[in-house]
Amino acid sequence: MLKYNIRGENIEVTEPIRDYVEKKIDKLERYFTETPDANVHVNLKVYSDKNAKVEVTIPLPNLVLRAEETSGDLYASIDLIVDKLERQIRKHKTKVNRKFRDKGAERDYFAYSDVNGSTPPEENEGDFDLEIVRTKQFSLKPMDSEEAVLQMNLLGHSFYVYTDAETNGTNIVYSRKDGKYGLIETN
């Protein structure tokens, strides 16, 4: 069962908005054999230029669905978000099913329906093991976040793991889509 946590910034989340969000995101349930127990986090923001930004995060047991969209219309942003989430699910479903088909067993991980809405007969369930194709080991060097960003850019990576010189904790810097950088601090 999907539980919704809908927050608004510079906008009051009215009952019609809440109903629209829930109705649209509930359509994603058709992709799963059983409705997943998940907390759906939805942030609605309205900017001074009247653009509306919608962010949705749905943490699932084997997958985290996340999308954000900005447009001039809140309802259009919600529709676009659902389209993005559907594409993510279909892409992951294809990847998982291809992996299990290649191993000779398929897992009924997602719901399947063809054009007529019929479902396939029961299939054998294989072990749900994702294959790790490469392992790297390296020493974490103490540094600050600025130096970590420089190292990441120097290596041409989209993220970089390092030990924070002040806290001695393991941190991760990463490149964001907007060209800025993010920092993940571990406990």
From Swiss-Prot:
CDD domains, alphabetized = RaiA
Places the protein is found: Cytoplasm
Does the UniProt entry include the keyword Cytoplasm?
yes
Q: Which GO terms describe its cellular component?
A: cytosolic small ribosomal subunit
Q: Which residues constitute the signal peptide according to the record?
A: none
Gene Ontology biological process terms from the UniProt entry: negative regulation of translational elongation
What Pfam families does the entry give? Ribosom_S30AE_C (PF16321), Ribosomal_S30AE (PF02482)
Family, per the entry? Belongs to the HPF/YfiA ribosome-associated protein family. Long HPF subfamily.
Q: In its UniProt entry, what is this protein called?
A: Ribosome hibernation promotion factor
Q: Which organism is it from?
A: Listeria monocytogenes serotype 1/2a (strain 10403S)
Output the lineage of the source organism.
Bacteria, Bacillati, Bacillota, Bacilli, Bacillales
